[in-house]
From Swiss-Prot:
Taxonomic source organism: Mus musculus
Lineage: Eukaryota, Metazoa, Chordata, Craniata, Vertebrata
Keywords in alphabetical order: Repeat
Domain named VWFA: residues: 484-681, 923-1094
Gene responsible for this protein: Vwa3a
Signal peptide (residue range): none
Protein name: von Willebrand factor A domain-containing protein 3A
SUPFAM superfamilies linked to this entry: vWA-like
Region described as Disordered: 1-25, 701-734
Sequence ranges of Basic and acidic residues compositional bias: 701-713
Length: 1148
């Protein structure tokens, strides 16, 4: 027991000047009382209250709270604070020992503050040893039960002194309480009142008279007094004044008090008054320590005085005096020696402190807020109503509407059918409208050019908006737009490592976005709910500062009671939500809520209905929770967590914002802007298509005219001269027109049979090249219906059957790709999207081997090879027969395919799939090697196994079981169990207690796993060769396989042991399973940019050589697609070069 001796001189001086000094010592901002604000009937009570006003605040003030607000740490007067104010320098390059330099002003200021603090502590200690506080200590609580030991009360000076001290206690401290219950105890108990009484002048006077009538009794029956006082449940503080040793043992009293106060908040205060010879102080001190109470000892004869409040102040004073001496030594001694001692002391101090003290803090983290006045922000949806493409009349359909015409269809009575009008292809371009119909568009290039310039300016505005949304507090919270706001902070125990991050995020919000709001409040929630204010308060500079100081004291504890926090906000802060507009709740959380998502969604949908109130979720991702001996209350992967909160926000008509260390993962505000940018790009591409269609028509005209001029004249001279028949009659004209029409169609078809690219310009026919003609199917001949018109002998005709149009080569730009998160093997996944199946081979764009490059016939080379760009592949020259548009379409498709491959690869390397691969079967058993060699990896494996349970087994499997094997087998369950939430929680607890030891008995584990009924897949995780023969295991599995047909998937922690790797490969292949090996951190860091970005760039490195089957098959297909994409980009550059040369020749 710590003892401290203090001056025992009684100080009963109540001089007003001294009382004023006491107020100053306590740093109390107490305004002067020049009159009573409330008038009472009893004037005597008013006078007594005024007389005790000067001591009221001091008496009510708790010593722990006072020391917390005036400690060295709170005042920034610790060793670490001193060193942080210095400057670290290296005097020369060879000396690696840093020196810390302090300015004279810094040292003097620090010394001055330390001296003032020491003086404050000494004044506080003097105050604690005055009047009743010296004899009985500082009484806590507002409803006090007072037990007075009357066993040693006797006549004489001691009795008079004890009565005076009790009277002083009544006047100075008990008069400030709300209720009192007093009794004396000896052999029997003598209560003053039957029940606790309200404190008033009459009750205090009655108590003083009762104290003077106390009579001594023989023994001290404390137990009977405790039974009497604990019957009154409303008391929150119990003061026991002992003058002799109790009759009962301290252990018996401690057990009784603990049982009686179970579920109640009662503070125990034990005081021994001048009885150190009769009562062992150590026994009572241990008793109060066990009860979490307060022990006070007072004995002026032996100069013994023990007070915990004074002891704590003395310890803090000694720290301050020691630090002051070190600061003074800095001015005279070698700074480096002093600093080395300081650093050692800091290390010891940090080791003793809380774990959160080790967390790094931003600069000026605890400084007052620097409040800014923001603009009136809007959500992206509201902002786009003013600045969107439709609002700015920049929709492509709005621009094309004046020049868009519907195709005309009318019923022709004479034909008894509906006839559709046709237009010449040069005049208009057919274009698909937003409603799915097709319209004829008159293309005006200057208008479209100006429109694309306006689109570019709009996209720049949207990009600026995206950048603005990604800065400062908007990166964390999004835009806080409502006028009445409540902030919900997640301070569950899983966020203990991130409490500084949570506080800093709140600081940014308070500084940048809340100063222009009307009302606000902050609610912190873990298992319990803690609110800054009972209800919302008006936004002001002082309130924002107070809220920040409150947030600095938040501690993480408990689980994540999201429903309780929402109920507090909705039912208390927004109890009048139907009477106000522009109201919002911002939930800042880092994990899955304790309650079921459907329950939360149903609650917010009902609570938020019919009022202008929104729930916005700000989810920060801090990584998968680490597995230890205490599993989390509720578990979900980050994707499931995000999905859950998105469902909740949709039910509450709010917005979802998800960010992490690398940036913003998902945001409704950002998605709205990105969608508008994509719409603008889509409009721009359609404009380019319209202009390209118009240019293609013009180029075809020019090329056809040029070909007519370049036709050899010898061809015309060799044609026989035609003999024209005599003028026919009208029916003959009709029949000949049919014949001429058919001949014309036949000749046009013959021209189309020449061997040249379909989309290229037409080539002149060369005689003697019959082998170049292509065989085609006979085309449908047109059929005419002839009739005489009403105008004389004229003949009319209409087509009854039309000729088939020429087939146009198209690149399928609307390819269908599977989802990246499809639960299947890579072999099944790539079977639906491999390049060959999608018909994306690049060889289709190349013609046959060019035979004219080495030919002596110059004209053929000039007329054929100059029209098509050529490229040399493996020593052979081949022509590129695709147009630039077709090549662009192919590149777009390939980029889409490679992006899909990258997203699938990222999915396979994320979550539990990185270690375990993809679980395919519905009924599975996980076999985990827990031999001694697995010790270094066991903690990581346990964390990933918990993630596997919730991410794959819970969602995709019907039943599962876990089995660990070393020398012996350890089963989680005897059979496969359904993957319910309760079963997953039990599995987590089982995983938490796994330990690594012993050998590797793979055969016994597989034999046991094959015995499970209805099991479909086994997943074997190990790090090396088994203890038994590999061939024996393979033969055994093969025999089991013939009977059961269970697939065995193997997982190797390392690929260094090639023998073990080959064994696991063969074991998986034997049963039709897959082999998997997790990717190392080094290999993963090399492709991190590719996976995060989602698409490839030229500078991206090649994929590493994956060992696992799923990753290897996908990587092979990705590499093949990447090579084709690079080759297509080379071909595009050749086509661009050829087109540029053509344009130069045309301009000349």
């Amino acid at each position: 027991m710590k003892k401290c001796r203090w001056s025992m001189d009684r100080n009963t001086d109540r001089d007003p000047q001294k009382q004023e000094n006491k107020k100053t010592m306590n740093d109390l901002a107490q305004t002067s009382q020049d009159g009573l604000l409330v008038t009472h009937v009893n004037q005597t009570q008013d006078l007594l209250q005024l007389q005790g006003r000067e001591t009221q605040t001091s008496a009510l003030e708790d010593s722990e709270d006072w020391l917390a607000m005036h400690s060295l740490k709170f005042e920034k007067l610790t060793l670490a604070d001193l060193i942080s104010q210095g400057t670290v320098e290296l005097e020369d390059c060879n000396n690696a020992v840093p020196k810390v330099h302090f300015t004279t002003q810094t040292i003097h200021h620090f010394k001055s503050r330390l001296s003032d603090t020491i003086e404050l502590y000494q004044q506080r200690m003097r105050w604690l040893t005055e009047n009743s506080k010296k004899a009985f200590g500082l009484i806590k609580g507002s409803r006090v039960g007072l037990l007075i030991d009357s066993s040693q009360v006797s006549s004489g000076s001691q009795t008079k002194e004890f009565q005076n001290d009790l009277t002083g206690l009544i006047d100075e401290q008990l008069s400030l309480k709300e209720k009192l219950y007093v009794l004396s105890f000896g052999v029997t108990i003598n209560p003053l009142w039957p029940d606790p009484m309200e404190v008033s002048t009459s009750t205090l006077q009655e108590l003083k008279l009762w104290v003077k009538t106390l009579q001594p009794e023989g023994s001290s029956n404390l137990l009977q007094a405790l039974k009497k006082v604990f019957a009154h449940k409303e008391l929150n503080s119990l003061v026991i004044i002992l003058r002799s040793c109790p009759d009962q043992p301290s252990e018996f009293l401690s057990d009784f008090i603990q049982q009686s106060t179970l579920g109640r908040s009662v503070f125990i205060h034990v005081t021994t008054y001048k009885c150190d010879d009769h009562v062992p102080s150590a026994v009572l001190k241990n008793l109060t320590d066990a009860l979490g109470g307060y022990y006070h000892c007072y004995s002026p004869e032996s100069e013994l005085y023990t007070s915990r409040d004074v002891v704590e102040l003395q310890v803090e004073t000694h720290k301050a005096q020691g630090l002051l001496s070190q600061v003074q030594a800095l001015c005279h001694n070698n700074p480096c020696e002093e600093l080395s001692c300081m650093i050692k002391e800091i290390s010891i101090e940090i080791a003793k402190g809380p774990f959160t003290s080790l967390l790094p803090k931003p600069p000026k983290h605890e400084a007052p807020l620097t409040i800014k006045f923001p603009d009136l922000d809007k959500t992206s949806a509201e902002w786009l109503k003013i600045n969107g493409l439709k609002a700015k009349k920049l929709s492509l359909y709005q621009v094309l509407a004046p020049n868009a015409f519907n195709p005309v269809e009318e019923f022709v009575p004479i034909l008894q059918k509906t006839v559709a009008a046709t237009i010449h292809e040069k005049a208009m371009v057919q274009f698909e409208w937003h409603d799915g119909t097709v319209k004829n568009i008159h293309v005006d290039p200057p208008v479209l050019f100006e429109y694309q310039k306006q689109l570019g300016k709009a996209v720049q505005i949207y990009e600026h908006r995206l950048q603005w949304l990604s800065l400062t507090s908007r990166r964390i919270w999004g835009t806080v737009c409502q006028r009445r706001v409540v902030i919900l902070l997640d301070v569950s125990v899983t966020n203990s490592m991130y409490i500084i991050h949570i506080q800093h995020s709140l600081r940014l919000l308070l500084e940048e976005q809340l100063s222009n709001k009307d009302y606000f409040n902050i609610i912190a929630f873990g298992s319990t709910i803690e609110s800054w204010r009972p209800e919302m308060v008006a936004v002001s500079h002082d309130n924002l500062q107070r809220a920040w100081r409150w947030a600095l004291g938040l501690q993480c504890q408990g689980s994540r009671n999201v429903l309780g926090a929402l109920r507090k906000a909705i039912e208390v802060d927004f109890k009048d939500k139907n009477k106000h507009e522009s109201q919002g709740i911002y939930l800042f959380t880092g994990g899955i809520p304790d309650q079921d998502v459907h329950i939360l969604s149903a609650y917010v949908a009902e609570a938020y209905g019919g009022c202008d109130l929104q729930l916005n979720v700000c989810l920060f991702y801090v990584g998968e929770p680490q597995m230890d001996t205490t599993p989390p209350a509720c578990y979900a992967s980050r994707t499931d967590t995000a999905t859950a909160y998105k469902e909740i926000t949709q039910a509450a008509r709010g917005r979802f914002h998800w960010f992490g260390e690398t940036g913003i993962y998902e945001s409704d505000d950002i998605n709205a802007i990105v969608s508008e940018i994509e719409k603008a790009l889509n409009y721009s591409q359609k404009c380019a298509f319209l202009v390209a269609s118009l240019k293609n028509h013009s180029e075809k005209e020019l090329q056809s005219g040029a070909l007519e001029k370049d036709k050899p004249r010898t061809l015309k001279q060799s044609q026989p001269k035609k003999h024209y028949p005599p003028k026919p009659t009208a029916p003959s004209v009709a029949r000949m027109s049919i014949k001429d029409g058919l001949d014309g169609e036949t000749s046009s078809r013959l021209k189309a049979l020449k061997c040249h690219p379909v989309n290229a310009a037409a080539q002149p026919e060369k005689e003697g090249t019959v082998e170049q003609r292509m065989k085609t199917k006979p085309r449908t001949r047109p059929k005419l219906f002839l009739f005489y018109t009403e105008a004389g002998n004229s003949v009319g005709s209409v087509y009854k059957r039309y000729t088939q149009g020429k087939s146009i080569r198209r690149i399928n730009s609307s390819i269908q790709l599977p989802r990246k998160d499809t639960v299947c093997s890579s072999q099944e996944w790539t079977a639906t999207c491999r390049l060959k199946r999608l018909k994306l081979e690049l060889s289709k764009c190349l013609g046959p081997n060019c035979r004219y490059q080495k030919s002596v016939r110059g004209p053929a080379l000039a007329e054929h090879c100059t029209l098509f760009p050529s490229i040399e592949i493996n020593g052979v020259v081949r022509h590129i027969q695709w147009t630039l548009w077709e090549m662009e379409t192919y590149i777009t498709c390939m980029e889409k395919v490679t992006r899909c491959y990258v997203q699938r690869l990222h999915w396979l390397l994320s979550g539990s799939r990185r270690l375990f691969g993809t679980i395919l079967e519905r009924n599975v058993c996980i076999l985990l090697d827990t031999s001694g060699s697995m010790g270094p990896h066991l903690q990581w494996i346990k964390t990933e196994l918990v993630l596997l349970i919730w991410e794959q087994l819970r969602k995709h499997c019907a039943r599962f079981n876990l089995l660990s094997f070393a020398e012996d087998l350890q089963l989680w369950q005897d059979t496969l169990v359904e993957s319910t939430e309760a079963a997953c929680h039990k599995a987590m607890q089982w995983v938490a207690h796994l330990q690594a030891q012993g050998s590797t008995s793979v055969l016994a584990a597989l034999t046991k796993a094959f015995s499970f009924q209805d099991v479909q897949g086994l997943y074997l995780l190990t790090d090396g060769k088994p203890d038994t023969s590999c061939s024996l295991i393979l033969n055994t599995v093969q025999s089991f396989q013939k009977e059961r047909g269970v697939k065995v998937h193997t997982i190797s922690l390392t690929s260094a042991d090639r023998t073990a790797t080959e064994f696991l490969r063969e074991l998986a292949s034997l049963s039709g399973g897959r082999y998997h090996c997790p990717v190392s951190d080094k290999a993963l860091s090399g492709i991190q940019g590719l996976l995060t970005r989602g698409f490839i760039k030229e500078r991206d490195p090649k994929l590493p050589l994956f060992e696992g089957d799923d990753l290897r098959l996908l990587a092979e297909e990705f590499t093949r697609a990447r090579n084709l994409l690079k080759q297509a980009q080379v071909f595009r550059s050749q086509l661009l070069k050829k087109n540029n040369m053509k344009s130069k020749v045309t301009s000349c």
